[in-house]
Amino acid sequence: MTYESVAQSELSPEQKVDKLVANMSDADKVRQLLMIGIHGKTLNDDAKFMLNEYRVGGIILFDRNMESKDQVKTLIADINKAGKSAGLTPLFIGIDQEGGAVARMEDQLIKVPPAEELGKAPIEQATSLAKQSGAELKDLGFNINFAPVADLGLTYGRSFSTNPDEVVRYAGAVGKAYDEAGLWYSYKHFPGIGKTDVDLHADTSIVPVSKETLLSEDTKVFIDLIKQSKPNTYTIMVSHAMYPQIDSDHPASLSKAIITDWLRKDIGYNGVVVTDDMDMGALANHYTFGDMAVQSILAGSDILLVCHEYEHMQEAYNGLMKAVKDGRISKERLDESVKRILLMKMSKIS
């Protein structure tokens, strides 16, 4: 039984996913939870090893992997070919292409201004650029863009506005444009990092405000976007910031109180939750990769981004496998995430 044969059957999407999951080993399920960065501009032996040995659920590319459109097309085609040869379910192929300060290969791809600049222009401009950029990324072989930013007033011009309603309007329009271009997209960084005071790439940042304040400001954006966006077209990316008035012990990406109790139960989001990069200092300075991977899945995350070091991805995988074997991560909890991931993949890849 292959992904393709099940995907093309007459079953409902949920039945297809149930059938796939019923025939997966624990190891194959765990691998769906990992999306990793690779090194090099070609599919070198190390990258092939990671695909064949660890059979991950997705790959994310950075400037280190990209030098020209033709080269990127070839690399992604080779990744997909290697994945298919290894018998993998189709891979998420991701990129961070927000525009402005966060843009890859910006000398050769459509130049998208910072969100702050777009937020001051007519919304049609933001929508048009997102459609053009999305179509370009799709043509290169990407299927998910980790954008748009849904935070309020973030530094480096990454936010559309400090006004929650304006961020909803612009981020929602941009997300819809990516979907129409054939890409999945991601609203980030739940529950909002506009009030952080430390770069999370460097270390932990504490957001010392109440849940009520977040609900009327930063998190209101995510709630409104979830209400208006089509299921399985997007993910919610959770931040590594700490919100001590909600959970004094864990950053958001490791917090059951924030992901399961708040985002899933209270807000009602049933889709895929992806972490921000676990190689960032906000987590990597304080946890082992095995521990953070296990804690994040127990908290309610589905996909763990490990973007830079193969060793860290291996530690995360080994930690997850140990937790599945000793029962800390139950079969039911593991299957929940895998089903969400496969249902999302099934929505665009047959």
How would you name each of these model-derived features?
Residues 25, 67-84, 91, 162, ...:
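Second-shell residues forming the walls of enzyme active-site clefts
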Residues 115-171, 175, 179:
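A substrate-binding/cap region within the structured catalytic cores of diverse enzymes
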Residues 57-62, 142-149, 300, 304:
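Divalent metal-dependent hydrolysis catalytic cores, especially in the metallo-beta-lactamase
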Residues 39-52, 125-136, 216-224, 287-295:
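Short, acidic/polar
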Residues 39-41, 64, 96-100, 149-151, ...:
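Active-site beta-loop-alpha junctions enriched in small/polar residues
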Residues 33-43, 115-128, 203-217, 279-287:
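Active-site mouth loops of central-metabolism enzymes
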Residues 2-91, 97-104:
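N-terminal hydrophobic targeting/anchoring segments and the immediately downstream early-domain regions
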Residues 80-110, 129-149, 175-192:
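Glycine-rich, aromatic-flanked loop segments that form ligand/cofactor-binding clefts
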